[in-house]
Amino acid sequence: MSKAPLAVALQYEKGTVPVPRVVAKGRGDTGEAILRLAREHGVPIEENAALAEALAQVELGEDIPEALYRAVAEVLIFILRASGKLK
């Protein structure tokens, strides 16, 4: 596995986007740029190398596969709780 930063951005909007979808992904300089933009815009970042590698296999604009629903749901719940949007 490469040491270059890997970043995968997901879009999910309850009621609008029913399944999280991959909207950006990249390794190295591109991964760093995705992370920088996320930080600049206050987008939560979760570090999970195994999940990022699995999500990186999904084509841009595609919904995540059902096999990753649980792992992604756990990340979304963590983010919502951390932001105070879920108690």
Description of each model-found segment:
Residues 1-87:
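Divalent-cation
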